[in-house]
Amino acid sequence: MLNSNEKAYEYYRMINPIEHAKTREEAKKYKVEPYVISADIYGQGNLAGRGGWTWYTGSGSWMIVAGLKYILGLEIKDGYLSMNPHIPGFWKEYEIKYKYGEIIYNIQVARKKGQSTSFNSEVEMYCNNQRIEQNKIRLENNGKIYNINVIIQ
């Protein structure tokens, strides 16, 4: 997935169980729970499309990490919130509402008008309209609401 936003998103969707059970026919073919990560999906023969080996410990949590950190770009580390999005080219913007203790972070991420996104795109981060150096904010449980704007250059 490194160096390709589109590939990362494609692979994420490929293993996302809901993508295999959007219709009644797909769910009948998939045959496993549409809310649990499947370890494998048959690709050939009359079992093609069927899921197998569900309920692996940890796979759901890694799916969340992959989506939040490596695609949406949200990272919480050492008491800081940072954003480093790697979204596919057809996404123009998205929002995340993140709650930390009594704090609410309303995060809006948008591509600079006319910009495409490469894997190494630079971002600018603003908190309540103030530019944030190093694109990270210290998490403090002060009960405030913060409006974060992230602009993909």
Feature locations, PLM:
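Non-catalytic C-terminal accessory modules of carbohydrate-active enzymes
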Residues: M1-Q153
